[in-house]
From Swiss-Prot:
Belongs to the eukaryotic ribosomal protein eL20 family. This is Large ribosomal subunit protein eL20. GO terms for biological process: translation. Transmembrane segments: none annotated. The gene is rpl18a. It holds the Pfam family Ribosomal_L18A. Signal peptide: none annotated.
């Protein structure tokens, strides 16, 4: 298995496509094995949180970033875990 890396995914999503459509920019930091997996994770999260269809999301850039540049503390804490403990 490969090493899990941090990726920055930037793009635009179409909000209110039926009345007064508007494109919103987004920047999302995710952990993934490959850039393709990072894009898949972002599409899944945007669809879940904002009810946006995949064809209403345009990915503009996927960049691997070092852990020092990730502003999301939750991702850094998850990356430092070595195992899960079930109660």
């Amino acid at each position: 298995m490969g090493e899990v890396k941090f990726y920055l995914v930037e793009g635009r999503m179409l909000i209110r496509h039926d009345r007064m459509p508007e494109w919103w920019k987004f920047r999302k930091y995710v952990r993934a094995l490959k850039p393709e997996h990072a894009v898949e994770k972002v599409l899944s999260e945007l669809g879940s949180n904002h009810k946006v269809k995949r064809y209403h999301v345009k990915i503009e850039r996927v960049v691997e970033v070092p852990p020092e540049e990730v502003p999301d503390r939750t991702l850094l804490v998850l990356a430092s875990l070595t195992r899960w403990v079930k109660p």
